[in-house]
Amino acid sequence: MSDPVRLDIEDGVATLTLNRPDNRNALSPEMSGAIIDAIDEVEASDEARCLVVTGDEGTFCAGGDVSSMVELMSGTAELHEAVEGIQHETSRAIRRIAEFHLPTIAKVDGVAYGAGANLAIAADITLGSENARISFGFRQVGLAIDTGTSYLLPRQVGVSKAKELVFTGEMLGPAEAEDLGLFNHVFEDDFEAEFEEFIEPIANGPTVALRTSKQSIDQGFNASLKEAMDNEATAQAVVFATDDHEEGATAFMEGREPDFKGE
């Protein structure tokens, strides 16, 4: 059997591909563990400058693995222990995406459902194809939300709309998801080419500056204006010392495009 996750690092882009299309890339404990291991590998790499998360063969991620849950429920473990065990690994995987230090992009071609929808919006940027669909339809299997929905979804669409999407389990098409801000952009013509064009300035950008900016934006949600400014000033002092800042400033003065190395 093939590995549940494929990891490729090329031209600064680490691409993590969920690779269980026969199971619609569901987040089984095995899949979640493989996601975590792959992210650990990217974190240790000197080559990666951004992380792309996608799914194989036209499916992003169908959410929690119901078959694994049923199997554990029928075993000897207590019900709550079985459920917590599955959710723990899935939640860890989604948290690693949300908290990863490099810019992260979810590349959604096909369905992102339940916990799979959380995996998609946990990324910094979510891009969809004309075939992309997204639903927080936990209700369809008689379950409450989990794996970070209560944190991630209201921050994207607001509290009232988040409740509506959860209560109805509505499957959103790409245009609706883009209108709500769940997808940053939808590329309908040539998804692969347009996706590559979009991420190029991220992959070839000033990596230290971008990851520092990401951290500052995340911190800013829970900070006062003064605290945010102080945090930015402290971080900027570090970025000032990078080779990419020197290159950027030099290129600006010389009237040319900078050639950032991510250092």
What do these predicted regions represent?
Residues 1-56, 244:
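Conserved CoA-thioester-binding segment of acyl-CoA-metabolizing enzymes
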Residues 1-15, 19, 170-202, 212-220, ...:
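Amphipathic alpha-helical segments at domain termini/boundaries
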Residues 16, 20, 34-35, 53, ...:
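Terminal peptide-recognition signature
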Residues 30, 34, 89, 96, ...:
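Charged catalytic carboxylate motif
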Residues 55-96:
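Glycine- (often His-adjacent) and acidic-residue-rich active-site loop
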Residues 58-62, 112-114, 135, 259:
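Short, active-site-adjacent cap segments at secondary-structure transitions
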Residues 82, 89-93, 149-152, 161, ...:
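Hydrophobic alpha-helical segments typical of transmembrane helices
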Residues 98-210, 241-242:
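Crotonase-fold acyl-CoA enzyme core
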